[in-house]
């Protein structure tokens, strides 16, 4: 039986990439009975019925899946933020980082529009980049005008399924065009406003870029922390995890507990204060969330 990855789903057909060829496949009837929907990104076993067609027989276990966009087995999220226009937002970046890490997806931070950074903004921007690198995140500085960082970003895509995410206007389309010029995506084509009614499923496709597969639809269009419990939130702040062993209380949430090593690290400047402030704002958001029944 042949194996491959679903790179596109459209009108009941699934397009499976296998050894450089694409097969147009249908799912077995048993999937419908079991209410299983094959997703873009699924690793599947299929039976070829001709040179170009086949039937999906089995879907391998998924590492993860996203609801919006509907895609499975995402390995990394390219979080695109602009240094300016719109201004760099640590709160939004930290929100993305929490969501991405909660799905066991590797985040890669891209700071775009570095060519627009002036002398006034430069020291602040450089400090942010240093901070996130020190925490352990991969940070790539890019510019689609000077082509800064484009080759470096390409090397990160190889062999992985990636989604691009980030607010509107940060240059996601321009960046994808720089990575693969023949795409010619219109700027703002990759819309961040995907929710057009509850039951609308946006067509998703994986594009081959730099030896990897990249979703043509932005990931994490819904930014609510709905699936994250208060107790797990500190786990998505790596610099908190490093120090939580030294907290007096096991399961310390680093809010108001005595002898908290994380708060001490914030006070002594070892953890950036904005990271802690963002954490506390997420704590409040989760606490205020209405219980689901």
Curated annotation (Swiss-Prot):
Principal place of residence: cytoplasm
InterPro entries according to UniProt: G_CP_dom, NA-bd_OB-fold, P-loop_NTPase, Ribosome_biogen_GTPase_RsgA, RsgA_GTPase_dom, RsgA_N
Chain ranges of the CP-type G domain: 63-223
Residues reported in the UniProt entry to bind Zn(2+): 247, 252, 254, 260
Subcellular location: Cytoplasm
Entry cofactors: Zn(2+)
Similarity field: Belongs to the TRAFAC class YlqF/YawG GTPase family. RsgA subfamily.
Oligomer status and interactors: Monomer. Associates with 30S ribosomal subunit, binds 16S rRNA.
Protein name: Small ribosomal subunit biogenesis GTPase RsgA
Encoding gene (name): rsgA
């Amino acid at each position: 039986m042949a194996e491959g990855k679903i790179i596109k789903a459209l009108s009941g057909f699934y397009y499976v990439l296998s050894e450089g060829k694409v097969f147009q496949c249908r799912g077995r009837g048993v999937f419908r009975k079991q209410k299983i929907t094959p997703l873009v990104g699924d690793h599947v076993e299929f039976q070829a019925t001709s040179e170009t067609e086949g039937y999906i027989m089995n879907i391998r276990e998924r590492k993860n899946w996203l609801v919006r966009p509907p895609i499975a087995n995402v390995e990394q999220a390219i979080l695109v933020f602009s240094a300016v226009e719109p201004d760099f937002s640590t709160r939004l970046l930290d929100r993305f980082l929490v969501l991405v890490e909660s799905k066991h997806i590797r985040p890669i931070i891209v700071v775009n529009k570095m060519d627009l950074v002036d002398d006034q903004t430069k020291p602040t921007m450089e400090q942010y980049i240093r901070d996130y690198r020190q925490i352990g995140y991969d940070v790539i500085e890019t510019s689609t005008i000077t082509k800064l960082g484009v080759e470096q970003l390409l090397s990160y895509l190889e062999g992985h399924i990636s989604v691009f995410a980030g607010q509107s206007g940060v240059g996601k389309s321009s960046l994808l065009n720089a990575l693969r010029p023949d795409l010619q995506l219109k700027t703002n084509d990759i819309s961040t406003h995907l929710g057009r009614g509850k039951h609308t499923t946006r067509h998703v496709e994986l594009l081959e870029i730099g030896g990897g597969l990249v979703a043509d639809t932005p990931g994490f269009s819904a930014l609510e922390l709905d699936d994250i419990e208060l107790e797990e939130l500190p786990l998505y702040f790596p610099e908190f995890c490093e120090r939580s062993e030294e907290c007096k209380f096991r399961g310390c949430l680093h809010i108001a507990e005595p002898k908290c090593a994380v708060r001490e690290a914030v006070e002594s400047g070892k953890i950036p204060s904005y990271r802690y402030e963002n954490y506390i704002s997420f704590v409040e958001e989760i606490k205020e969330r209405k219980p689901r029944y």
